[in-house]
A protein has these predicted regions:
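Rossmann-fold dehydrogenase core element
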Residues: 129-155, 183
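Predominantly a Rossmann-like dinucleotide-binding segment in NAD(P)-dependent oxidoreductases
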Residues: 156-260, 427, 454
């Protein structure tokens, strides 16, 4: 039995998580939120089928703290134990993420957090940007020691369209030994937030972060996954370094595009809020950005460019909002999504994503998969004859789902979230694991420093730390590919295998039967961030019995960390 604690119950949690709990009949045992919200939460839960759900509150004075107070943490843990909580989902304002991640991991709980992983106040300051990066690595250390799992809700990890794209890219990169050479990512969510909206707490700007840390994080995550695909290539095609040049469009910039007088003119037939009468020329000093634009380059060890990328992430795009009175900021304030991805593998392959909405979720009809529909998502493949005689292929996302899956669904992105939640609650796979976010965090960190540079009137390129002890150590798909393809013509049958993730490398122990030559082979396989991939301590046996004994010995060695000799061998390889 899975018993869930939900931390934070705002518009996003209500639409996504509570819908999922009702649909899948999941036990929501506990909601945690601020004391000021207690009555509203109780009313909402009672009216929506969660009368048995308990509520735990903490004082509003702690909402911006980095750590839960000791007494609050102790009381919350006691409640979680009483209710036998097995999984914890964090859906608070991101400033509170760290305290609950710390609480969950220290107490060996399975935890899922919304993106971004953490933020701090005053995110235009270098101190806060450094703090967010530092917090990520602190969470990693906690996750290493914890018996619980830790995942980040980036639902495109389970989006069938993007899964297909990653599969095709991986196949072409590996087969033709050609890297992804260009990635262009555009996303607009048409969030027209007007001057009187900018003090909001939900997806705020006033703490110094905007689009990049709002929905932008999904595309940082996506970009990092694309870059990792190139890592199967070695030699001069191996990416070891990167940098980014950033520009942003700020709320103050927007006031020069759309002034207070413009608002009065556009909405002259509506009741204008007092804000516009009292603030003729408002300023938003060091508020978060409306739009983020980044030019990224990734280099080999000689300093030559392997991959270029562009990020165009905007709030300041076409919207359906035609009213000045504020509605729900999450999905009912005129937001519409435009998403476009363009990926090149040199002259061999071009993949494009086109996903364009023209209406709000509340205007859903039965026909939503055409251009302009809520579920429009098409993938185009343009092929060089060297890789595919068919010059063009097209996939409609809806064709990848059954009619049964489409019943009672909120959208394809939401189906992806459902798959994520299913796998999180059942510990099925490692997608979205906190340990796989290091490259995304390093890219985010450098992009955020670029925003700081603009606010500080500095014009400079920021380095991206592409390789450290974490950024490439947990790429499950690539590791699986490596092991599956390892001398496939000779190793058709794996009898046993064991995988151990270390800080800077991954160890496998394999017991395989080489059918064509009628012997068993047992070895340790190594994949590490120093570009080493090799087999160690290999032995061959005619006897299955002795092969298995040797396999168990190697399994014991790596499982019990008796690995000093192996580490020396790894060092000698590098």
């Amino acid at each position: 039995m899975k018993n869930i604690a939900l931390i934070g119950i705002g518009p996003h949690a209500k639409r996504i998580y509570l819908h999922y709990f009702k649909k899948k009949k999941v036990n929501l045992e506990l909601v945690v939120d601020l004391e000021s919200e207690k009555n509203n939460i109780r009313k909402y839960l009672d009216e929506n089928g969660f009368k048995k759900t308990k509520i735990f509150t903490l004082s509003d004075k702690y909402k911006d703290d980095e750590h839960l107070p000791e007494d609050v943490s102790s009381n919350l843990l006691a409640v979680c134990k009483t209710l036998e909580i097995t999984h914890l989902i964090i859906s608070t304002e991101p400033k509170a993420h760290f305290m609950y991640l710390e609480f969950a991991l220290k107490n060996n709980m399975n935890v899922l957090t919304d993106k971004p992983i953490t933020v701090a106040k005053n995110m235009t300051s270098l101190h806060s940007i450094e703090k967010v990066r530092k917090q990520y690595y602190e969470i990693l250390e906690l996750a290493k020691k914890s018996k619980g799992t830790c995942k980040v809700m980036c639902q495109r990890q389970y989006h069938r369209g993007y899964e297909k794209i990653k599969d095709v890219l991986t196949d072409v990169v590996n087969k033709y030994k050609m890297p992804i050479t260009n990635i262009d990512i555009f996303h607009s969510d048409g969030a027209w937030e007007m001057p009187h909206d900018l003090g909001k707490e939900n997806h705020p700007y006033k703490y110094g972060y905007g689009k990049l840390f709002h929905s932008g994080y999904h595309f940082i995550d996506l970009l990092s996954d694309f870059i990792k695909i190139n890592d199967s290539l070695g030699g001069i095609k191996k990416i070891v370094d990167g940098d980014v040049y950033s520009k942003v469009f700020t709320p103050n910039d927007e006031m020069n595009v759309l002034s207070i007088e413009d608002y009065k003119r556009l909405f002259k037939n509506q009741e204008i809020p007092d804000y516009y009468k009292e603030n003729e020329n408002p300023t938003f000093k060091k508020y978060g950005e409306k739009d983020y634009h980044g030019l990224l380059s990734f280099y080999n060890k000689e300093g030559f460019t392997i991959t270029t990328a562009t990020l165009n992430l905007i709030h300041n795009g076409v919207s359906r909002r035609s009213w000045i009175e504020t509605k729900d900021f999450y999905k009912s304030n005129g937001r519409i999504r435009h998403e476009r991805i363009n990926i090149e593998i040199g002259h061999l392959l071009n993949i494009q994503v086109h996903s364009y909405q023209s209406k709000e979720i509340s205007d859903r009809t039965d026909d939503e998969e055409k251009v302009g529909g809520l579920e429009h998502f098409d993938i185009y493949f343009f092929n060089n004859p060297l890789i595919d005689k068919e010059p063009f292929k097209e996939i409609h996302l809806g064709d990848m789902y059954s009619e049964k899956e489409k019943k009672e669904f909120l959208g394809y992105n939401e189906l992806s979230r459902e798959r994520f939640l299913d796998n999180f609650l059942n510990n099925i796979d490692c997608k979205g694991d906190i340990r796989d976010q290091a490259l995304a965090i390093e890219i985010l960190y450098s992009c955020a420093k670029g925003i700081h540079n603009q606010y500080a009137n500095k014009n400079k390129v920021e380095k991206i730390l592409v390789r450290n002890d974490y950024t490439y150590r947990f790429i499950s798909k690539r590791l699986k590919q490596y092991s599956d393809n390892l001398d496939k013509k000779f190793y058709p049958k794996t009898i046993n295998n064991k995988i151990i993730y270390k800080d800077i490398y991954t160890l496998y122990v394999y017991e395989k039967f080489v059918e064509k030559q009628n012997y068993y082979e047992v070895f340790i396989s190594v994949d590490d961030t120093k570009n080493v991939a090799g087999n160690l301590l290999t032995k061959r046996f005619k006897s299955k019995f002795f092969a298995h004994i040797y396999y168990k010995i190697l399994e014991y060695i790596i499982s019990n960390k008796k690995i000093s000799s192996i580490e020396k061998l790894i060092e000698s390889y590098s």
